[in-house]
């Protein structure tokens, strides 16, 4: 009787049960040392003592995917958007030197489609595997009065740990440090309200539009998952004293690079020191944006930046390459005279 009444209110309890069964195999893939309990418990659990840290500091992060979700919904492609959600969270706590331990997701939708929900959680689990984090819990909320039947929102939450003496804070970066950039896969998960306006409103492209500068259809390019930098950067942290890390997200170079600096420092970025991905030229062209706007909004092909002493540059590059990462020396830290970010060198973009 109660279930029938709930169904009449638009909530499909049976579909929720189906989702749980469908996602179990994906959650199981993310198991790691320290993870405790079973799917369906009231709370997710993690045994911090399993890490053998002397003075553990917990670092937490939460984020969503923004309006990139609208492209996934319109394209009916849901199996990678979860990677974006994980990436946005774990890359942020990595900037403090933390190893991601576990992850939880939150999905709100107008109508629970078990197949779609499984695809979303599959992506979350894929991201957790890349990050080495256990998926220990989550919530799927069916709210027909708040969302359309095909609509959903996705958010994530992660917790990591680092030894207190190895915690990375803005006070460690010094004038003379070298900036090492690690490439992005594309736009990642920021700036999509503008990107969607440029391509689909102002220029009326279709999702499957073929643009000469791109080697895949437009929507495929725009849905490329955000890269997860956890494993290669953790390897660097074992070998090198990294002074600062920036996750280049919303606000691009201009807003994010200063976040690892004290007020007396600036960064000098050598333009042309890394390969520019074609998607940024395409966005600039069709959006009629200037150079500074691009660097204020997008990652411009660099998703993470490490600040290291000059004496550690060679070792840092070596470890990254050994772990399958391309990496580029893209600039240096200087004393600040005016702007916190200075662009110099070759052609912008």
Curated annotation (Swiss-Prot):
The keyword Glycosyltransferase does not apply. Its EC number is 6.3.3.1. It holds the Pfam family AIRS. Gene3D superfamilies: PurM-like C-terminal domain, PurM-like, N-terminal domain. Keywords: ATP-binding, Cytoplasm, Ligase, Nucleotide-binding, Purine biosynthesis. It is found in: Cytoplasm. One of its GO terms (molecular function) is ATP binding. InterPro entries: PurM-like_C_dom, PurM-like_C_sf, PurM-like_N, PurM-like_N_sf, PurM_cligase. Its main location: cytoplasm. Pathway: Purine metabolism; IMP biosynthesis via de novo pathway; 5-amino-1-(5-phospho-D-ribosyl)imidazole from N(2)-formyl-N(1)-(5-phospho-D-ribosyl)glycinamide: step 2/2. One of its GO terms (cellular component) is cytosol. It is an enzyme of class 6 (ligase). It catalyses: 2-formamido-N(1)-(5-O-phospho-beta-D-ribosyl)acetamidine + ATP = 5-amino-1-(5-phospho-beta-D-ribosyl)imidazole + ADP + phosphate + H(+). Signal peptide: none annotated. GO terms for biological process: 'de novo' IMP biosynthetic process; adenine biosynthetic process; purine nucleotide biosynthetic process. It comes from the Bacteria. The keyword Flavoprotein does not apply. Belongs to the AIR synthase family. HAMAP family: AIRS. This is Phosphoribosylformylglycinamidine cyclo-ligase. The gene is purM.
């Amino acid at each position: 009787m109660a279930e029938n009444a709930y169904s009449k209110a638009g909530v499909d309890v049976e579909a929720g049960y189906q989702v749980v069964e469908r996602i179990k195999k994906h959650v199981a893939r993310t198991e790691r040392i320290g993870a405790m309990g079973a799917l369906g418990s009231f709370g997710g659990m993690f045994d911090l003592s399993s890490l053998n840290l002397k003075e553990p500091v917990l670092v937490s992060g939460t984020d969503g995917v923004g309006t990139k979700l609208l492209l996934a919904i319109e394209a009916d492609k849901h199996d990678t958007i979860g990677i974006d959600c994980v990436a946005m969270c774990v890359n942020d706590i990595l900037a403090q030197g933390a190893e991601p331990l576990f992850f939880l997701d939150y999905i709100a939708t107008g109508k629970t489609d078990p197949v779609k929900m499984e695809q979303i959680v599959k992506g979350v689990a894929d991201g957790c595997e890349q990050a080495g984090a256990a998926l220990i819990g989550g919530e799927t909320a069916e709210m027909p009065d708040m969302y359309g039947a095909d609509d959903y929102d996705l958010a994530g939450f992660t917790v990591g740990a680092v030894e207190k003496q190895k915690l990375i804070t803005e006070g460690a970066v010094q004038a003379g440090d070298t900036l090492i950039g690690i490439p992005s896969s594309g736009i990642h998960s920021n700036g999509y309200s503008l990107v969607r306006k440029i391509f689909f409103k102002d220029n009326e492209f279709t999702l499957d539009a073929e643009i000469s500068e791109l080697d895949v259809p437009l929507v495929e390019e725009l849905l490329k998952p955000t890269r997860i930098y956890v494993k290669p950067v953790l390897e660097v942290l074992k070998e090198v004293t990294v002074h600062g890390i920036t996750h280049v997200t919303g606000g691009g170079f201009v807003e994010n690079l200063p976040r690892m600096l004290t007020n007396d420092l600036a960064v000098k970025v050598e333009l042309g020191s890394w390969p520019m991905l074609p998607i940024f030229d395409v966005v600039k062209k069709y959006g009629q944006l200037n150079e500074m706007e691009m660097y204020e909004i997008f990652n411009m092909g660099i998703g993470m930046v490490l600040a290291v002493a000059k004496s550690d540059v060679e070792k840092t590059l070596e470890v990254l390459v050994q772990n399958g990462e391309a990496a580029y020396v893209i600039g240096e830290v200087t004393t600040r005279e005016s702007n916190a970010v200075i662009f110099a060198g070759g052609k912008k973009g």
